[in-house]
From Swiss-Prot:
It comes from Shigella dysenteriae serotype 1 (strain Sd197). Pfam families: Pribosyltran. One of its GO terms (cellular component) is cytoplasm. Its cofactor is Mg(2+). PROSITE patterns: PUR_PYR_PR_TRANSFER (PS00103). Orotate binds at residues 34-35, 128, 156. The keyword Nucleotidyltransferase does not apply. This is Orotate phosphoribosyltransferase. The gene is pyrE. Pathway: Pyrimidine metabolism; UMP biosynthesis via de novo pathway; UMP from orotate: step 1/2.
Amino acid sequence: MKPYQRQFIEFALSKQVLKFGEFTLKSGRKSPYFFNAGLFNTGRDLALLGRFYAEALVDSGIEFDLLFGPAYKGIPIATTTAVALAEHHDLDLPYCFNRKEAKDHGEGGNLVGSALQGRVMLVDDVITAGTAIRESMEIIQANGATLAGVLISLDRQERGRGEISAIQEVERDYNCKVISIITLKDLIAYLEGKPEMAEHLAAVKAYREEFGV
């Protein structure tokens, strides 16, 4: 695990974005941990979040021309990632996002920001069922752009309805790489170094045995 990944886990724990316990997911599964990126909700949180996203992007080595943040959660993520890339990596790249509702005055259409063209890096918080990605792909393709990759904060590395994860489905269906700041594997590695969190480690490992990919 790289230093920025460890720092991201500690940041998420400090903001209670990442919690351990027993949680019922939308799928009905009982999970020993929960991740709610909506709790990154202050200026400082966003500034830090952008740095972690930018670090993961640069680390991935994937080449892209533009950041796209799907409405609504992807909008602040794309914005802060663009700022962090410019400030900390000297990469001044365009970004844009979509509106859920098209506008009939002012800037036309359902896109805000830079023109959606070239190789697009889609940034979002998590992929649960992959629905937001599929909707975004329609927008990207309609504008003649291509998907370079997808960046999210956490890859839960668990099966969807079938034998593979929603992330693996996205990679298969769109022939692109999905990268994440951290994965379930990183989370387990972090817990292994924290003896005081042994009960959480056991629960997370048991969950991975049952639902992991």
